[in-house]
């Protein structure tokens, strides 16, 4: 079993790096504001039609463009969900959503979280799935990538005030990266057996003679961007464990690759744009070390089995509860770590049925800010916050003004870095405390004791860090939970983007200092260790008391 797990992890990472390297070169061209071959004429036409200016923006203008697009998308999606019964492509005549569920869902998809307090096949029409959710899957992913584009430019430009043009970046990211790759993935999914139609639900007779209603819909097109954009919201309630979304072992492997593809490519692009590819490799090494350790822990915990079931005489020594038999425990463990290391949240197994330690690792990966590969754009700019913090700590230890890539890190940058890092832990801890203090929060818990608290902690951690996966034993479709999680998702997304853009605006105006004998090397194994230590100390220690009350207490009981 250990050899199989090692081979699975090694194969996954090897294929991932091979695919991400050329994509990283393409992203580097876009960051350097170099149009891809044959696209310049199309871009000019698309900008001329609505009269959008392609002049460079300062950080405030860039931020306002990103926020404006997302707020408009939030309003449109909210009203679309409220009135979906008036809109076309609704063969099942599904009614509009309640205001609190519509708000939660709109915020969820605009913030790239894709938390779902509903069952897709019984709640949303085809129009809502396509024109509402799928569109936001593209736009939220493009928004995250655009923010990291601006931050990378801040390190490579000197004595400037501009970071690029948000509309140009959003257009190029969507048209030349997300749409083509998602189209290829969608066609592959269709070839493998995923659904893509507009038919009404089909009544069929089962082998037992009973009648069953099979949901239909344009699944493959949404499934592709759901994974590529690290969105994670399933067309069906069972998400990627549903055979209509994820029909074969091959589609499952491609889904995992799609989740990590752009975050990995952005690391390669970062090294290429900064002129030192070792910087990108340093980030990948730090992420990969944490990732491999986490996968190993989850695999070990799930192979050991559930002690409570073993005590009752379970006929298997491994924990197969809540897992698809066609995928097995090792693949389910790898997928769980992939989807929570990134801000994806898609699942092929029920995380609520994992062992105490097996479920704690995905929760912890979210709580550290999803900086281990992370979401498209958000993972890298989240890790860059820890890089700046690690550089600052190292500067204090050696008595030098901290600097990174030649840019001095001053008080303003460190205040903004601390603010950005503290946003999500504050939301998680205060949100969990509020839920446990109120009857409305506690009434949603379907399990008592430490596991019930783990369900609450996981939900708030998932929302605040824009993941979207859940311990499904929490009945979250209530006004209290819909509003609480919507607030956590909104602030967790934009409460980090705003200080990140402010940091970019500060760094881009500085001159780049040449490296000297006293400059801290930020590309070697020493800095990789320092960065991992910073993530563990700052990102993880915050949650030790909460984890002790939940999964740790469950493990020891």
Curated annotation (Swiss-Prot):
UniProt key word Transmembrane: yes
Cell compartment(s), UniProt: Cell inner membrane
Primary site of residence: membrane
Coiled coil: none
GO-annotated cellular components: plasma membrane
Lineage: superkingdom: Bacteria
Membrane topology: Multi-pass membrane protein
GO MF: P-type potassium transmembrane transporter activity; potassium ion binding
Transmembrane segments: 5-25, 63-83, 132-152, 170-190, 253-273, 283-303, 329-349, 356-376, 379-399, 416-436, 484-504, 526-546
Keywords in alphabetical order: Cell inner membrane, Cell membrane, Ion transport, Membrane, Potassium, Potassium transport, Transmembrane, Transmembrane helix, Transport
Family: Belongs to the KdpA family.
Alphabetical list of PANTHER family matching this protein: POTASSIUM-TRANSPORTING ATPASE A CHAIN, POTASSIUM-TRANSPORTING ATPASE POTASSIUM-BINDING SUBUNIT
Subunit composition and interactions: The system is composed of three essential subunits: KdpA, KdpB and KdpC.
Entry function: Part of the high-affinity ATP-driven potassium transport (or Kdp) system, which catalyzes the hydrolysis of ATP coupled with the electrogenic transport of potassium into the cytoplasm. This subunit binds the periplasmic potassium ions and delivers the ions to the membrane domain of KdpB through an intramembrane tunnel.
Protein known as: Potassium-transporting ATPase potassium-binding subunit
Organism: Escherichia coli O139:H28 (strain E24377A / ETEC)
